Amino acid sequence: RFLKGKGLFRLLSDTIAPMLKSKPSRLRVTEDFRLFFPDYNNMEISLNLLPKVVYFLFLRHPEGIFIKNLSLYRHELTQIYRLLSHRDNLEDMNESIRKLTDPSDNSIYEKCSRIKRVFLQKMSDDLAQHYYVDGYPRQPKRILLSTGMISFPDALKNIKTVISREDYAVMNLAEIFKNMGIEEK
């Protein structure tokens, strides 16, 4: 009654009802790099700059990324950061990217944890698990959402990678075999 009296019942039911179906929504990244879920009443997820940079990197790599190999993605992270940031302080940007790609620094884990927390604040884990960065130990970390359910602006799609997607996939496979004790001969 309270919610109806305040006119909030309809708003809440329109937002929550689609999420109760436990079916992942499409994810739309706008031209100004905001994140929306069209199938959840256009619910928006807000991330701070560095977690958003990390999130977009993982969205661009559905094959997954081994955290220990993150330095291979430094150029791409820098390009995403420049695209999202309106600051010209290259020193700060380079230091942030250095920390993200340093295996001895926890920065990447902190950013992934923040991403997960933001999604869990907005939806149940059975839905959120499709959207946050996750993975088993000794496996590449990735976002589970199918690439067919993600729409990007061209500016984000057109960022050049230093290494081809195929080479990343081969490196990931080699790392998985190595972790299983299968060495190349």
Regions found by a protein language model. Give the residues of each.
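Short amphipathic alpha-helical recognition elements used for nucleic-acid or partner binding
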Residues: M43-E95, I115
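DNA-recognition element of transcription regulators
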Residues: L47-V54, T101-K122
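DNA-binding patch around the recognition helix
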Residues: S13-P24, V29, Y109-Y168
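Short glycine-rich, low-complexity/disordered patches
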Residues: I65-E76, E91-I97, Y109-E110, Q121-Y136, ...
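Short, flexible helical or helix-coil boundary motifs
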Residues: T15-M19, L84-E91, D126, M180, ...
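Short boundary/linker motifs that mark transitions into or out of structured domains
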Residues: L3-F56, H61, N158
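Polybasic (Lys/Arg-rich)
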Residues: I159-K185
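Short interface patches used for recognition in eukaryotic signaling and trafficking proteins
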Residues: F37-N41, E95-T101
